[in-house]
Curated annotation (Swiss-Prot):
Signal peptide: none annotated. It catalyses: mevastatin + 2 reduced [2Fe-2S]-[ferredoxin] + O2 + 2 H(+) = pravastatin lactone + 2 oxidized [2Fe-2S]-[ferredoxin] + H2O. The lineage of its organism: Bacteria, Bacillati, Bacillota, Bacilli, Bacillales. Cytochrome P450 whose physiological substrate is unknown. In vitro, is able to catalyze the selective hydroxylation of mevastatin to pravastatin, the widely used therapeutic agent for hypercholesterolemia. The keyword Oxidoreductase applies. This is Cytochrome P450 CYP107DY1. Gene3D superfamilies: Cytochrome P450. It comes from Priestia megaterium (strain ATCC 12872 / QMB1551) (Bacillus megaterium). One of its GO terms (molecular function) is oxidoreductase activity, acting on paired donors, with incorporation or reduction of molecular oxygen. Could be a valuable biocatalyst used in the industrial field for an efficient biotransformation of mevastatin.
Amino acid sequence: MKKVTVDDFSSPENMHDVIGFYKKLTEHQEPLIRLDDYYGLGPAWVALRHDDVVTILKNPRFLKDVRKFTPLQDKKDSIDDSTSASKLFEWMMNMPNMLTVDPPDHTRLRRLASKAFTPRMIENLRPRIQQITNELLDSVEGKRNMDLVADFSFPLPIIVISEMLGIPPLDQKRFRDWTDKLIKAAMDPSQGAVVMETLKEFIDYIKKMLVEKRNHPDDDVMSALLQAHEQEDKLSENELLSTIWLLITAGHETTAHLISNGVLALLKHPEQMRLLRDNPSLLPSAVEELLRYAGPVMIGGRFAGEDIIMHGKMIPKGEMVLFSLVAANIDSQKFSYPEGLDITREENEHLTFGKGIHHCLGAPLARMEAHIAFGTLLQRFPDLRLAIESEQLVYNNSTLRSLKSLPVIF
């Protein structure tokens, strides 16, 4: 197998057979790969094994805080600070949120944000999520066809997180436009200016909303965050803006792709789709298996907080240490028949939501949305099938496993 480059992890060609690509990668590469360059930010390491990924996720020697260990800080002379990735790192250094910092800041920020994601609050959303799902499917039922991405998998989580935050319905489409623009620009080193322009538009909108919430507080997450105090330690202005930005983007982008990827996986495994359609009680295990098999987040990352030796290789302090969630989720040492889809799989320690202190805060909400989306879709449209050949589907050039569209008929 040829030397691996960063483009291999996001090329649309490999997206057509993600499992096959990572299976070949794990069979022909060492468990820790070194990339010569990661989007203009210098060299990086990529861990492929489940156990190694768990170590990186949970061991405090691997750090998140880009303010401490970003290449922009340590290697200013050798890094092009005009690239899209550099601009994104620069923004993250100035706009910290719980995803980009370590304790004690992480502990404080997560505690404040978690007040919006208590089990009771998530469970209280169930009727509304079901209602939104029904309304979206009602709107396409008469046509007997839809683009599952545009008509269903994207609108559902956008509406849910927008209502949680108290964002007007007419503004919700902006979020998809901004996140689409950001993701595309971030993959192109020449688009640094576009990254910064898009982030500015996004943050300016949040600032405008915060002014309205200060003047007219409501029973929503944004109003609650404005009032948030923890041991007299208030969210700073930048922390507040970045936390809301994170909730908006993480609250819809990944769930949308989970739903569309999951439906495609079922369509490509008709025996599994029939089994789920005829046995709705399998929905909990089906959701976990689709998270493992078709999860949208393919790559995550940390920084080495000190010189670290893994598999006999020295990772210098400050270098990026990436990990492949896809490879970890098909590790044959952890899963039986890992490259197969089995919605009855019982032991399923997938890493799609991460591990440790950065475990996805919105995991219960994403699970609920997926459970309702898959179950209702198969109940309403039992003859659901692809409208085109799967080879004709187009994937985004992204580190997220994401379809541009998914035409289906029913």
